[in-house]
Amino acid sequence: MSTYTIPVGPLHVALEEPMYFRIEVDGEKVVSVDITAGHVHRGIEYLATKRNIYQNIVLTERVCSLCSNSHPQTYCMALESITGMVVPPRAQYLRVIADETKRVASHMFNVAILAHIVGFDSLFMHVMEAREIMQDTKEAVFGNRMDIAAMAIGGVKYDLDKDGRDYFIGQLDKLEPTLRDEIIPLYQTNPSIVDRTRGIGVLSAADCVDYGLMGPVARGSGHAYDVRKQAPYAVYDRLDFEMALGEHGDVWSRAMVRWQEALTSIGLIRQCLRDMPDGPTKAGPVPPIPAGEAVAKTEAPRGELIYYLKTNGTDRPERLKWRVPTYMNWDALNVMMAGARISDIPLIVNSIDPCISCTER
């Protein structure tokens, strides 16, 4: 067998963020993949130890734009565990609304990029146009289109009055039928999508367990793990929703899981807007921070996000560390790419929705 090596990245038109792949190929088939990280390392975990507990909310929001609610929420949960603060019920519902709003926008961005990679740019623009409904909603409700700045220690920074609820529901009423009746059927049946994604980048459920995969990548292979179900936080244990699961473990299944989850997220937001009780949106003043340790986890758009926080009795953490889904998922690219065509590499990489800024932190 005569093989040769193709370098892809760190700057490449098919990559959303800098990654370097050293890909060994035999003809048009991929034999092995070596991934090199470190191109956007920013030392954020170290920076967190030089900032106080309030400044770190802003810092964690900037770990990743698409997960900019998950990071500060998980950080706040860890800090609340150490201080013993109890988040008011209304604030818990508002946290879920912010969480699911970001999930819809994140998933839509990923599947839009899929359409762009296969050359279906009219579909890409259609998805991005529909995504603007959520972007406009974020700007109107939270004041920002990307880093929505919704989280506070012991609660949230925003609230929804009747007009705000009505506006939110109106936006969902515009988005949901567009996804359900116009966009998702194209991903399910259009040959431009189906022929390029079915049977590509296959992962078995056993592979998911072996590699510790999570998020839509694992659920696309039928591996039923979702923090919102297995270890519910906020008010997810009071909400009615089904976990989205795929059957084939390929690029297409992962895209379909993201579409199903987008619709599920819309349903969760509706439930929260309907059931949210009256009351405060934040607990009382933050008490003095005792020395202690805590671990918190949430279901970010890409999968399980874990934060470890160690405090020493001051207002600055002694250690703040997070483990993101991409860190676990990208090793499985070796399995997904083995035997794949060179032209399928961008599709396979995009299917794990890699967030390099999260991972290299």
Swiss-Prot record:
Q: Which cofactor does it need?
A: Ni(2+)
Function description: The carbon monoxide dehydrogenase (CODH) oxidizes carbon monoxide coupled, via CooF, to the reduction of a hydrogen cation by a hydrogenase (probably CooH).
> Origin, by domain of life?
Bacteria
Q: Which Gene3D superfamilies would you find in this protein's record?
A: Cytochrome-c3 Hydrogenase, chain B
Which Pfam families did the record assign?
Answer: Complex1_49kDa, NiFeSe_Hases
- In its keyword annotation, does this UniProt entry include Transferase? no
Q: Which organism is it from?
A: Rhodospirillum rubrum
| Cross-referenced InterPro entries | ComplexI_49kDa-like, NADH_Q_OxRdtase_suD, Ni-dep_hyd_lsu, NiFe-Hase_large
Record's keyword terms, sorted: Metal-binding, Nickel, Oxidoreductase
Belongs to which family? To E.coli formate hydrogenlyase hydrogenase isozyme 3 and to bovine mitochondrial NADH-ubiquinone oxidoreductase.
Task: Show the GO MF annotations.
Answer: NAD binding; nickel cation binding; oxidoreductase activity, acting on NAD(P)H; quinone binding
Which residues does the record give as Ni(2+) binding sites? Answer: 64, 67, 355, 358
What this protein is called in its record is Carbon monoxide-induced hydrogenase
Q: Does the keyword Metal-binding apply?
A: yes
